[in-house]
């Protein structure tokens, strides 16, 4: 066969298959049978196998992506991929509409309603109609380049075609990759038949497929892409509404979710929500709600964005999903400060998109409140990413042999006595750092980012070092360099890893008194309290010598916390560890003359979504002026700073007559004290 004839035949088959793909996936109107489609596909594949040098870049057979990658490259999003706010009931939905319509006075607002697909959000870049890059959402600012994997998705166009519209020079399309229910069921059946691990839900299957370094694995999975929006288009597409944008995307070859509704009122949106909820079991894909968007693109621009989400859209989530299961056992876990937490081991149950087999019961008081026993039938609830919880016990199903749960008398890890001071809800192991569970959690806390910030000393290192008996307490961290040969013998720990760890430990020796106090893991002492203690006592020696009465005078330190701090510094073992840490070279700058702190001791509350700054920035400015930032409003609150969507805290402030300040006024006040956004 002549070369030109081969290439021409390949081109004809590619165009024909693309046309039928569009009819099947996008228009949902198949024009040929599956067997006819397979015949065309295999005809093209046979030609390509015979003449591999003439395989075309946009061939559907090349969607099996090539060589496996060693890692995914990071990519910064030109337009951030923001998340959506959530509403969970009609009242919240109507409040969202009020906020929208108050910002668009005297304008008619229409809402575009779409299915909220339960998949993995990605961004696709096309240059002159050719797919050049696919990137995961990541943290919204930076994602991972998964181009090879997205090219394997069968319904995703690699080259854009349209008889109606001109193909833009640059186009960035956002959408969701997911696995339809039928494909998910078949995949799990195949996995089970091969004796391999099955997937908990379609979303996990889709996400796991896209994160395979070998694109051939992704190609074998039944993935689908559904477009939901346009991030960039050059030249501008000239479209004026969200609804038209979605239709335009279908003309270019993209598939969109199987239902969209244009609603003239928020009441109509609520009706569609109820309709979709009824139809949910019959849909081809998993959804966890619907997305409500202001339809007019100019109105979207007018509304703008909050710091992390658009004002013109929200996700209307479905109610919690529940399932019945039985409690097989209740175990007790020991935390960093010795707290004993009961954990119910359940007969595994699929609820809210995941298989749940463990649920925390928080404390013995919660066990008594629920009257939950080993062997009981319970209702487990879960919504979205919320941690599953036991909502109800069904005593009518209780077996005769059901066991009442008692607080253990001794620690399940070290056998030290369990204590529960009068008036407290939490029981604790009295073993301190003698208890292995407390020791490992204490070390994890000590090295964490907000404490000593020892980069690279993660859980795998800590567990290995504990097994080798190189870490008996946190002070041993600063002697690890003496065991270099032992460290090199740890699996997957090469010369570079060991040196990086030693360097990070050395770098952590220069810190601040506040960080050091926080790192000690004293019960009741968080970041804010540690900062207050450092400001008040100025030196470690003064803090160690302080009695309960002196400690109680520190802002943010109550009677009980003062006793916990005093007890910590009275324990001989703790003093020994402190002395070894200081001897190892941990140090901080000597205290300077106190700076002006006009808000010293005042309690401030931040509520709502802040637009002009982050909560961390606002907190840092307040703390620099001596104030403490509280999570709740009380009669002692000096002022409340309210952003968007401020709720119950704002109402409580009004009832108590607490002053309320908006962001602009707050920033002006801070500027007057010399505090500005950095």
From Swiss-Prot:
DNA ligase that catalyzes the formation of phosphodiester linkages between 5'-phosphoryl and 3'-hydroxyl groups in double-stranded DNA using NAD as a coenzyme and as the energy source for the reaction. It is essential for DNA replication and repair of damaged DNA. Belongs to the NAD-dependent DNA ligase family. LigA subfamily. NAD(+) binds at residues 34-38, 83-84, 114, 137, 176, 293, 317. One of its GO terms (cellular component) is cytosol. It is an enzyme of class 6 (ligase). GO terms for biological process: DNA repair; DNA replication. The active site is at residue 116. Keywords: DNA damage, DNA repair, DNA replication, Ligase, Magnesium, Manganese, Metal-binding, NAD, Zinc. Residues 594-678 form the BRCT domain. Its EC number is 6.5.1.2. It catalyses: NAD(+) + (deoxyribonucleotide)n-3'-hydroxyl + 5'-phospho-(deoxyribonucleotide)m = (deoxyribonucleotide)n+m + AMP + beta-nicotinamide D-nucleotide. NCBIfam families: dnlj (TIGR00575), PRK07956.1 (NF005932). It comes from the Bacteria. It comes from Acinetobacter baumannii (strain SDF). This is DNA ligase. InterPro entries: BRCT_dom, BRCT_dom_sf, DisA/LigA_HHH, DNA_ligase, DNA_ligase_AS, DNA_ligase_CS, DNAligase_adenylation, DNAligase_N. Zn(2+) binds at residues 411, 414, 429, 435.
């Amino acid at each position: 066969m002549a070369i030109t004839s081969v290439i021409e035949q390949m081109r004809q088959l590619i165009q024909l298959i693309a046309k039928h793909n569009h009819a099947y996936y996008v228009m949902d109107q198949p024009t040929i049978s599956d067997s006819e489609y397979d015949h065309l596909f295999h005809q093209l594949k046979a030609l390509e196998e015979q003449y591999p040098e003439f395989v075309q870049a946009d061939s559907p057979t090349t969607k099996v992506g090539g060589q496996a990658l060693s890692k995914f490259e990071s990519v910064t999003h030109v337009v951030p991929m923001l998340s959506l706010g959530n509403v969970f009931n009609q009242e919240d939905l109507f409040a969202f509409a009020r906020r929208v319509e108050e910002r668009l006075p005297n304008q008619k607002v229409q809402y575009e309603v779409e299915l909220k697909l339960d998949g993995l959000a990605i961004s696709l870049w096309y240059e002159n109609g050719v797919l050049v890059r696919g990137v995961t959402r990541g943290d919204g600012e930076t994602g991972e380049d998964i181009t090879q994997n997205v090219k394997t998705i069968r319904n995703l166009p690699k080259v854009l075609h349209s008889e109606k519209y001109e193909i833009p020079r640059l186009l960035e399309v956002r959408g969701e990759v997911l696995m339809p229910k039928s494909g998910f069921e078949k995949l799990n059946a195949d996995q089970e038949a091969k004796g391999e691990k099955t997937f908990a839900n379609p979303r996990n299957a889709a996400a796991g497929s896209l994160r395979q370094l070998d694109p051939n694995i992704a190609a074998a999975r039944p993935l689908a892409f559904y477009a939901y929006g346009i991030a960039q288009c050059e030249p501008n597409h000239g479209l004026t509404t969200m609804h038209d944008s979605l239709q335009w995307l279908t003309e270019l070859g993209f598939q969109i979710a199987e239902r969209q509704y244009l609603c003239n009122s928020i009441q109509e949106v609520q009706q569609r929500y109820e309709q979709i909820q009824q139809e949910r079991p019959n849909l081809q894909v998993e959804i966890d709600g619907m997305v409500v968007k202001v339809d007019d693109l100019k109105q979207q621009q007018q509304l703008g964005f909050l710091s992390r989400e658009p004002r013109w859209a929200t996700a209307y989530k479905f109610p919690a999903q529940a399932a019945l299961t039985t409690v097989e056992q209740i175990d007790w876990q020991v935390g960093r400060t010795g707290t004993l937490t009961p954990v119910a081991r359940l007969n595994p149950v699929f609820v809210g998109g995941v298989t749940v087999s463990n649920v925390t019961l928080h404390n013995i008081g919660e066990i008594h409140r629920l009257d939950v026993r080993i062997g009981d039938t319970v209702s487990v609830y879960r919504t979205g990413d919320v941690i599953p919880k036991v909502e109800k016990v069904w005593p009518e199903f209780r077996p005769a042999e059901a066991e009442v749960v008692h607080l253990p008398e001794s620690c399940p890890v070290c056998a030290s006595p369990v204590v529960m001071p009068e008036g407290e809800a939490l029981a604790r192991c009295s073993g301190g750092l003698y208890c292995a569970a407390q020791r490992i959690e204490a070390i994890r806390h000590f090295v964490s980012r907000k404490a000593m910030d020892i980069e690279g000393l993660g859980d795998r290192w800590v567990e290995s070092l504990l097994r080798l008996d190189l870490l008996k307490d946190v002070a041993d961290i600063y002697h690890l360099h003496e065991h270099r040969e032992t460290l090199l013998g740890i699996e997957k720990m090469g010369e570079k890893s060991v040196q990086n760890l030693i360097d990070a430990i050395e770098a952590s020796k220069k810190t601040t008194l506040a960080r050091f106090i926080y790192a000690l893991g004293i019960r009741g002492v968080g970041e804010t309290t540690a900062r207050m203690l450092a400001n008040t006592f100025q030196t470690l020696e003064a803090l160690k010598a302080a009695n309960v009465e002196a400690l109680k005078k520190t802002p943010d330190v109550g009677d009980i916390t003062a006793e916990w701090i005093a007890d910590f510094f009275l324990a001989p073992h703790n003093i020994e560890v402190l002395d070894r840490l200081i001897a190892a070279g941990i140090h901080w700058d000597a205290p300077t003359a106190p700076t002006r702190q006009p808000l010293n001791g005042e309690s401030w509350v931040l509520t709502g979504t802040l637009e002009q700054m982050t909560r961390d920035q606002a907190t840092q400015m307040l703390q620099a002026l001596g104030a403490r930032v509280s999570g709740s409003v009380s009669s002692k609150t000096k002022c409340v700073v309210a952003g968007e969507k401020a709720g119950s805290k704002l109402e409580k402030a009004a009832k108590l007559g607490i002053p309320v300040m908006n962001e602009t006024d707050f920033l002006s006040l801070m500027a007057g004290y010399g505090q500005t956004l950095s």
